[in-house]
Amino acid sequence: MKRILITGAASGLGLALAKKYASEGWSVCIADIQDEEGIKVAAHLNEEYANDCFFQHLDITSDTQWRELVALISERWQGLDALINNAGVGASGDIDTFSIEDFQWTVDINLMGAVKGCHVCVPLLKESKGLLINVASMAGLLHMGSMSAYNVSKAGMVAFSEGLLSELDPYGVKVSVVCPTFFQSNLATRMRSDNPDAAKIAARLHAGTGITAESIATIVYNDSRIGKHCILAGTRFSDRTIWRLKRFLPASYLSMMKSNARIQFADKNPSYRERGIFERVLRSIRARIL
């Protein structure tokens, strides 16, 4: 029976991933800071699939807790076949008003939590020629203004994963990085921002997308098994188009991003006049989304 460790698996995408892998016959370690929910998830998976699933409290920013978890897994399972670094938080804010403490908090969880997990789990994955999956975001590829902390943490995850792809290839370890856009999740409940309405806006974006965490989990399961590195799970046609625009017409992409920033500025400063038709078109699109 294959063995997988998933961080942030008590809710959201992590929960969907835990259910998907358990349904495919994997033993799952549900690692999370949400003890009550995590215990319930493990009990449900064992009842539903009769696998060796268990919960372990894990603060992914703690080196000590990571080492203790790996020791527990080594004793219980005698190895590990896959690690999914899924746990994360949301963040938004302008660079001069978003606190340095919140910036550090975002990077510590979204990026350094995964780094610490890989540091202690990769030796087990080398032994099993296993699978490493890091959950980033479309924000790791497309960088909106007023989201510097989140962008940095997710772009760092993309770069980290790409480096590990070649580093771990000689050991037979497959590495994937997942870059979804908005999907139905509870990320908005775990975010910090300098805008009091940010959580409400984020929740509305996540809820209205029509893309479920379960559909993302299925894509991740299927694509990672065949060794796909960058998994654009759940991304809409518009997101893929913007990603292609950035890759092939970077100047046009940057002009579009600056126009979007001017719209955001106009929202905060009613006396500011938008410069042209491009801004008005973007505002119309944003109105339909928000």
Annotate each PLM feature.
Residues A10-S11:
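Conserved glycine-rich cofactor-binding loop
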Residues D35-E36, H57-E68, I100:
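The beta1-alpha1 cofactor-binding region of Rossmann-like NAD(H)/NADP(H)-dependent oxidoreductases
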Residues D94-I95, S99-W105:
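Substrate-binding pocket helix/loop in short-chain dehydrogenase/reductase
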Residues D96, L142-S148, V152:
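Active-site loop immediately N-terminal to the catalytic Tyr-X3-Lys motif
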Residues S137:
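Residue(s) in the substrate-gating loop at a strand-loop-helix junction
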